[in-house]
Swiss-Prot record:
In late cellular blastoderm embryos, it is expressed in the posterior end. Then, as development proceeds, it is expressed in the developing midgut, amnioserosa and in a specific subset of CNS neurons. Isoform 1 is expressed earlier in developing midgut and amnioserosa, but is not expressed in the CNS. GO terms for cellular component: cell cortex; cytosol; endocytic vesicle. Residues 82-114, 295-317, 409-418, 671-686, 974-984, 1143-1154 have a biased composition (Low complexity). It holds the Pfam family VPS9. Residues 1531-1673 form the VPS9 domain. Residues 1689-1777 form the Ras-associating domain. The keyword Membrane does not apply. GO terms for molecular function: GTPase activator activity; guanyl-nucleotide exchange factor activity; protein kinase binding; receptor tyrosine kinase binding; small GTPase binding. Belongs to the RIN (Ras interaction/interference) family. PANTHER family: PROTEIN SPRINT, RAB GDP/GTP EXCHANGE FACTOR. Keywords: Developmental protein, GTPase activation, SH2 domain. This is Protein sprint.
Amino acid sequence: MVNAVMDAIALLSSLASDLDIMLNDLRSAPSHAATATATATTTATVATATATTTANRQQQHHNHHNQQQMQSRQLHAHHWQSINNNKNNNISNKNNNNNNNNNNNINNNNNNNNHSAHPPCLIDIKLKSSRSAATKITHTTTANQLQQQQRRRVAPKPLPRPPRRTRPTGQKEVGPSEEDGDTDASDLANMTSPLSASAAATRINGLSPEVKKVQRLPLWNARNGNGSTTTHCHPTGVSVQRRLPIQSHQQRILNQRFHHQRMHHGTSEPIPSGVATPSSLDSASVDGGKSHTGNNNNINNNHNGQQSQKSQQQAGLAAKLNVLAQSNLNNNNTTNQPGSMTPASNRTGLDSNQNQKQNLNADSRRSSSVDPDADADDVVDAAHGGAFEDDMQALLPKCSRRSRDELSQSRTSLVSSSEGGILAEGETSSEDDEEEPVEAEDEGEESSRDSSDNSPPCDLGLMERLLVTHPMWFLPGIQRSGAVHLLQGKEEGTFIVRGSSQPNTMAVSVRLPQDTGPYIEHYLIQSHDNVLSLESSRFTFGSIPSLIAHYAQCCDELPVQLMLPRVLREANNRKKLSSLALLGQEFWSYVSSPALLGPLTPSVAPSKDQQLLDAKSPLSLTETSGLGTATFFSDTVSKPPPTGAPPLPGGGLFSPTGSGQLLGFFSQAGTPSDTTNSSLSSFTTSGGQHMQLLSPNSVDSVILTMSPVDNPGHYLPGSTGAPMAPLCPSVVDQQLSTFKVAQTAPEVDQVRPQRPKPPNTLNLKPPAPPLRWSKPHSPDQNGSANGNFTVTTTVTFSMENGGGGGSGPTVGNGNGKFVEVTTPAASNPFNALLNGQASTFQTFAKRLSPEGECKDTLSSQGSSSNDSRWPPPARKLLTSPMTPLTPSGGSSSSGGKSRKSRAGKESQHYKESDILESPPMQYCASALSDKISDYEDVWSHDPSDRASLLTSFRPALDTVGGVMNRRPDLLAETPSTPTPTQQSHLTPCEEETTATPNESSSQSLLQFSGDVPARSRAGLLLPNLSGQVPPVAMTKSMTAAEDDGGDTTPTAEGQANGASRSKQGSPFYAEPADALRQAGLTSAATAILRRQHRSQMLHASQRHSEPLKAGFGGSGNGAMLQPSDLEKLAGSLDELKPKPKVSQQQQQSQQQQQPTKRARNRIDHWQLDSSWEFMAKQDTGSHAGGDYDTAAIDWQEKENSLGRDSRADGQGKKRTLTIHQIIANRLPDLNLPELVRCSTPPQTAALQPHVLGQDKAGVGCDGSQKSFQSQIGCRLSSYDNVFCQNSFGGIDSAQSDDGTIFSEPWDSSQWDTFLPHDDATINSDTIHLSKCRPALSEDDTIVEELQSTKDGSNGSCNQDTLKANRNGAGHHKLNNGNGNGKANNRPKVATILRNPSMRDREVLCHPRNKMSIQSSGPGDSLRAYTLQLAQDPSSTFARNIENFICCTKESREAAPQVVMRNMRQFMSGMKNYLVKHGEGKFHAELETARARLKSDEFLNLDAMLETVMHQLVVLPLREHLYGIFVDHYQRSEDIQLLAQNVRYACEREAADFGIRPTVTPPSQAALRLIANLLWRLQEAELPLDKLELFLCVISTVFDATGCPRGQQLGADDFLPVLVYVVAKCGFVGAEIEAEFMWGLLQPTLLNGEPGYYLTALCSAVQVLKTFMASEGESGSGSLDWRSSCLPACSSVLRVIIPDECNGSLQTRTLPVRPHTTTREVCRIIAHKARITNPQDYALFKLVDGEETLLTDAECPQDARLAAKGKHCMLAYKRIDAKIAWPTAQLAGH
């Protein structure tokens, strides 16, 4: 029989390749097949077997019957031992070929009795597979072999195991027993064939081959001793015997019961091995490979008859069996027999030995090394001898086994506990675990902390510390932006080694100190021949840790020494470091840096009933992990319930899966089943009450779970010792905070700084951020009258040193700057949870930057959408920590430092949303506007302030019919009506606000500590705000002084600090509400600055928005026409949008709205403007009278919402920086004046009559035109038509009938007199009135071109037709009065302000620019949708824009031309993407727009999308690009050179600029107007706006020269004039502005006039740079423009153009930019010379009459200079033309 067994072994060894097919069938085999079926199968497959097989089957039936009888019997420990010893002897006997007769007898006895009770499915399949392989097998297998193989399927088919971290608690004992069965089948496959082991594990367990490859093969191959799997192994002997430790159903019940009882006891006694140590049973099943002790044999014989049922049952085993099994394992490892199965036995013993250690370490919960889900690190540890198997492997040297063991053991323990419960962190190392198991998590905080702190301190070297902690700082999977996120707010010198986009390189990102470089710098690590070094460094290293260690010890090449975070530096033992290393990347978001936490403060001394159970302090960092946070209870506070006691009601743990269903109830010691890979945030309350906040993988939010405590009264943080109502039905307003409340000051002496909980970075949606302005309420409010449980805690940790009374808890010294806020979205969350509803609790975790600014861990829109509509009874008033307190308030909640000092610490970076803490889809679920400052520092406004657009100093508004009844969703978190309970939470200042009964129901006031309406990174106004922004939203920045940093509000004490504070203590100067709503021209801060420049002649009591009183006309107006008054005349063409004439009745209605207002204002100032009522109606005051038609209203609102408002309001924190200001700031040595108008004298009085008259004429026609005074305030208001008619006329509105209610609509006599009646009145002094509509007097080329364009596009010269086209509506025409006819008769009437002629407007309404103006046409909806799409972060369009802006700002590219080229390419690419592929509903909107087009119209998508892309891309990068420009030209010293020459040229006369006497230079008045236009050009933000204004400048220059219409003013004359204008106006930023437009405008837009005049500007700048040198070289004191030897010729080209019609040569002077190519020059010439076939022409170089064709890429200037000294000319002629050039030199050549 034994020989037959060995023959079968030989046969099976030769069939290793066939076993892969057998195992494929194995997976599909039924695991619970009936015995009869299995028997039939066996009969069919072993037809050739002997009678012994039949007897075995009969015996199998008998054994199965016996097993059913014995399932309820619990065996004693010695039974189990005898089984193990017997099986060990079995192995020995078979391995040693019956060397011992005693063993042989035992083996024979086993043949009769030791049968398996389960169907022989496995052996049947294997035999059937063998036959299918066409191999004849004589089944002489003995009954023992059959039964041993059948025993492999003794257990039912194991259920698929859940993921390791999500297995329910109830299965945590069943799982290990089942997985052994799974693993054993894999063992079989691995022992049989090394190639099929992975597949076998996969087929049996359902896991991916990749997982098995990582977790199993390296371990097994390494542990076979020779590095390869033994190929002669077979599925008998050892592999069969190892199948023993399968638990029966009874044993599983026993395990669960014991585990449940153990959990309730909360003890550290080990579970009996027979119950919970399957790995030890595995060990026992294989030890004794060569055991011949008589004791074992006797025990086997005594219990031989009972072994047939022991393959499934496990009984209680004494703890000493573990020691015995361990000794047997050790003995087995040293007992090898040649020529036997001992190598496999030894391998198994090693596995079991490893299992024994890990099982003890994991608290007897699982067998890790043979478990399919064993931690890969354990496998790696065993396979590679402790080397790291991760991204470090190629870079790190082999490290010590000891430290890796601790790391792997600690990680194994933590992973194990995350399945069956969160362990206390204090796992002992592998050396200690052999003696005692780890304590469970319910041992209490102190016991668990002791377990981690008991490790003796040791001296850890830097290299060892780096190696152990490498999972934190070595993050090759992240890129630049991720590293920047992680290092925000960390210590100087903190670093992260990350991946790099360049091949064979990595990068180390370092947080640099101030004044040493950027906030975070990145240094490349290069690898050459396996040698590492920093880029361009002379130091080389063999590994990254050695490189880091070097730069951590010296500061040779880096500006700062590298260092680990403080927590890692101060860890004094390996155990703590290893535990911290488990956090990996989450460490950075998990642990606050010392820069934020400040010095560690001693722990809070717990009171009798108030234990500070804080698992988040830096002193206990190792008690938490990214896999789950361990939270503890103090035994002194709450005792565990009695053994076996059912869970208390209300202590249920609720599912965080989003469905809200109950998973079950657990006792206090129970830990949540972490079914969604969630991380636990913990709130430890003062009464020992434990609250866990699970961050679920659901859309909504955090589920609030509470574990019950013994005492029925639960102590809440807000309570002072009085027990509260029972937990579930409790109706309380409580503060959930990680801080201990300050009311317990007598009990709590000191507070330890807190540590925030990190959201899991895998599947979790991080908690939403809190409102930054919210502050804690008065803590004495523990109950409310309503029936809702509202946990609306808004806890702000004070950053100041002092604490204020009555302002909420003040913790410590203010160093712990972390806030966690829990807010509800359901009225009764606990009842909702118990009823299975999804609750929407949110945990707001906020991080503080080094400067003290709060940063949200996720955007505020990442929170649940359900919380956007809180029921008013469930709300608690969210008060503002910045709320100003009156002097009677007694104390300030912020205490300590002044607001100015705090504002100085404002961080501009990374206001919210750590990308690494958010899964991609969840991160993109929030709006684009929520990611305002992820990558940039342009806007300092905190995104959480978006929800508070009302300032705290605003008097309460009546919400009935008010604006708050229609407030947008972004204001949804604003409580609309504070209840009496809520009022008790107000700070003293707020209590004053709501003191009266009438105000008790008014709108609560929120602090708007950022700026006026928030703008996203793309510069967009937040949705729903443009038409609904309460007007007070702007008063903050209007009334705060500039030096306050835009982050403070004026207080009563500080209101006398400057004129920018509100008048008489009020922030309101009664600016019209509609002007505030549509403040789209400039920011409110600009308006404040301009207000300081108001005329000194005005009386102090004169309100800014009030019409001037009588007596201020005449000469007084001269003072009002100052540069500061004129500089903001109109924002753009859109701001001067034509509107219809206002009828007298409508004007009357407007006038009648303010009679009392006007009278009262003569006496005092309003505290609140009555015009707010129009804001409440979402209308302007004039809309109530209906004076504007619907299209005009729609246009204005849409324009404000889509771009104009956003471009201005987004700058709410500061004025738009101009290039002039940037240069003045960067180069203070230049001493540039604030407004460079050094040579402009005051405006003459002779100009004023025309100015005033024409302004009033424009008003008479339109009734809504802004006056100079109104534009000083930078606003568009319906009230402007009231006083702009008399602001400059000096007539009081009460006495005037000019355009007022006394005028009849048909009576034009009142305003006819102001219209000019002949062209003589049109001179250069009146051009400024047109601003964006200047008269055009250019050369005939442009005039004729524009005329043809006009005729072709509009069909007539009727200006109203064009206006209707611009407005996209046909009803925007003026009434057919005298004014209209006169306007048509005189194309250049002064009313071009509203009704410019075709000729006068066309240069600005260039076809390329019209679509940018025509925003109310068919393409308006498409434009609006595109902007909306850019705010949807889930769209590819928005994400690409965001990423591009981020990369551009982080790039170190120093060449502005390269940056602009990238921006231009990106904008073009995104336009193509939208048009070709579309996204969202773009194509649907496009089809809708197409349907609105007429048959002869088309929609210029390119122009429309161009304006959109400018807003989305150029606007956010504007100042960044300007900074690059200034740096670039500063390095080249071009700015200094230009400023020096401008200062010199400013004093020169017109003749010195080479202006011929026949050309009249611009007058001083014209220069003044041009200077204002140039200033407005610099303030314009977008290239198209700048281009419009620049064309205005050019047109104004032409008219200012007085050239008769149609007269040619060529480049020879125009360039000197332009140089003169630039010098006189001090336009130092001319070159940068020209380059800005050149680089960012679409190239096709620069064809024709825009490109020509931009080139002229560049040429003028080049001339100015060499002005002094050229003047000196000329010898005449003036520039000679026709001299070819002057340096100025580098910017001017003189080109000969032969006229083949008459045989003459024409000479043209062309302005050129430096290094202009031939192709560009040819394009300019073709345009100027009206060449219709430019492809037939080319530019030639004539040197001594010899023609040389210049290629397109050549530079004509260089070619000419290269021929200097010779007679060289440039000729533009037809390529095929044969021309004999004259030998006489032309003039000027």
